[in-house]
């Protein structure tokens, strides 16, 4: 399984637009093959900071996601809304039973 985390802090004047675009992006992404989960969360300590957590079945599914025109457009649009540089981290993981 591939886990992706990312975040950005929106300029205050763009927060509503950033929220709407982010929700549109995660809802579309959830329909893609290999997407196990995709969510956006608003940081309760900084409401302008949006945090993304994604789970993908494998690297091929994530690569396909990054190739979707909507994903590329989302990344470009976030750059216009962000106050600072967005973060993105990708991890390979396996589920552990306790």
Labelled PLM ranges:
Residues 10-15:
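Short, surface-exposed ligand-recognition loops at beta-strand->loop->(often short) alpha-helix junctions
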Residues 6, 18, 38-40, 50-52, ...:
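Hydrophobic packing within well-folded, soluble alpha/beta domains
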């Amino acid at each position: 399984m591939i886990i992706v985390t990312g975040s950005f802090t929106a300029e205050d004047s763009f927060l509503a637009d950033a929220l709407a675009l982010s929700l549109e992006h995660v809802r579309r992404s959830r329909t893609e093959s290999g997407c196990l989960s995709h969510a956006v969360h608003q940081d309760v300590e900084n409401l302008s900071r949006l945090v993304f957590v994604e789970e993908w079945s494998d690297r091929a599914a994530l690569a396909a996601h990054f190739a979707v025109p909507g994903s590329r457009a989302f990344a470009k649009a976030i750059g216009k809304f962000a106050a600072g540089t967005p973060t993105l981290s990708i991890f390979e993981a396996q589920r552990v039973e306790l």
